[in-house]
Amino acid sequence: MSIPAAQVAHLPTRIRRRDGSQAPFDNDRILSAIRRAGEASGEFAEDEARLLTSQVVKVLSHGHFPGGIPDIERVQDIVEQTLIAANHLGTARAYISYRDQHRRLRADRQTLVDVASSVNEYLDRADWRVNANANQGYSLGGLILNTSGKVIANYWLSHVYAPEAGIAHREGDIHIHDLDMLAGYCAGWSLRTLLHEGLNGVPGKVEAGPPKHMSSAVGQIVNFLGTLQNEWAGAQAFSSFDTYMAPFVRNDGLDYEQVRQYIQELIYNLNVPSRWGTQTPFTNLTFDWVCPEDLREQVPVVGGVEMACTYGDLQAEMDMINRAYIEVMTAGDAKGRVFTFPIPTYNITPDFPWESENAGRLFEMTAKYGLPYFQNFLNSELKPNMIRSMCCRLQLDLRELLKRGNGLFGSAEQTGSLGVVTINCARLGHVYQDDEQGLLARLDELLFIARDSLEVKRKVIQRHMDAGLFPYTKRYLGTLRNHFSTIGVNGINEMIRNFTADRDNITSEPGYALACRLLDHVRKRMVEFQEETGHLYNLEATPAEGTTYRFAREDRRRDPGILQAGSDKAPYYTNSSQLPVGFTDDPFEALERQDDLQRKYTGGT
């Protein structure tokens, strides 16, 4: 049909399909849909359909759409509104019913999993998920987990989360992590509780009392972490490992070689791919190095019997444990390959012995493998007992837990993250180029979707835990009230590049300032979320191993002109708000440039 020239000049030239791809805008398709709807209801025919189409086109010509491109749903909304305004209520009802019917059909198709395709994609390694997890090899267990994971993911997206969350994830605006598991993200546990009570308390399962010797303590730790790993998607952590294990060294009268043997057994057994999907359990151990002040006067209990000493008297035993752990990790396995787990985290406190032999061994291991994480308590108001580190980068600031009313130390080790949602920041920069107000408005929409999905997940996991789906979590944790909901960001460097048409990136002053404003905005919203929900929220520099590729691949498919890192065949986005890969090989320059940004993350970096 003919359109007035003035309207043609302002009409969109392209339209965005539901899968995110674009197609040429064709007003005749609008005319066809309206005409068929009118004929079906019997309210009007060709002439009225043309008049209504011209009204829809007029609205579109004056509309403001992200990137100047309307999506199909928005066009159909305008058609609906036009039919109602013209008093064609019967046609409008039929049109709305038609849309809803087809929406449900699309949802049903998305929920279905093509079994043959899923299995073949894995066997042929054609699915990017095959390599998305560095801890899961190509195996029968991986095939089973990959296939079942698609079913669970569709269950979350189609039957648990609100439709807007499913749409935002599928279209790559956000990434809801661990959709393939009906479980929480990561958890920290009390090693002291395990050693005092033993591995027991779950009906119908084998029980063990408190360990009396280091050998049985190591066995219970391995079994505990492996068992709990099967009830969580991510990392399982123990804190103060050297402090709590030192009494067993003293009680058994062990020499260094014996301690080293037990530590070797611990590390080897925690690197065996015994977890679902033939994965290695994702584990983290935090080492105090020097006995924390709040534990120094406390009396250890071994096998239910108090010892004739305090934790503060066991520094020599702690030193043996730390030496053994470092030497075993540095040596690697029988072929000299690095042990991936447990990831060690070391507390750097004012009394850290920098000149000791163990410190030298620690930094040699760091130089060789880059293995450990360090928690810096120098010039900090925080104390080691106030922070517990777990997972890749989830570092929990437990000052947030003071308001929970159950004491700081008692809840310190019983924390974690229930779920993670990452925002695709690169796309925001591309769609809202030079429009910071529009970018922040869309960011808010995505943050609200993230919040709502995390709140839903909290309710679902708590309900299933109460019903016995996670028996060991129920036994050793019981409540999720001290677990955070985590929101992360990805591709801030590419966001800046796209936002400024590549004039700036995160290394330039304007780009850095934009990154700071964005993170401050997210932090402000998260404080509001905490006040609204009564639940803990934190901002994490998401590792985004597979997510960064998924975002980039999806955006490249939608618009090949978007600025990305990597190559055409392997695009990616720079992790969180980090410097571009290869920008500098000077670690001190990198630290200086990232200092203010990294401090904005409340959940780890």
What residue spans do the PLM features occupy?
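Amphipathic, well-packed alpha-helical segments that form the structural scaffold of globular domains
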Residues: 35, 57, 451, 455, ...
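Core structural elements
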Residues: 78-84, 288-289, 471-495
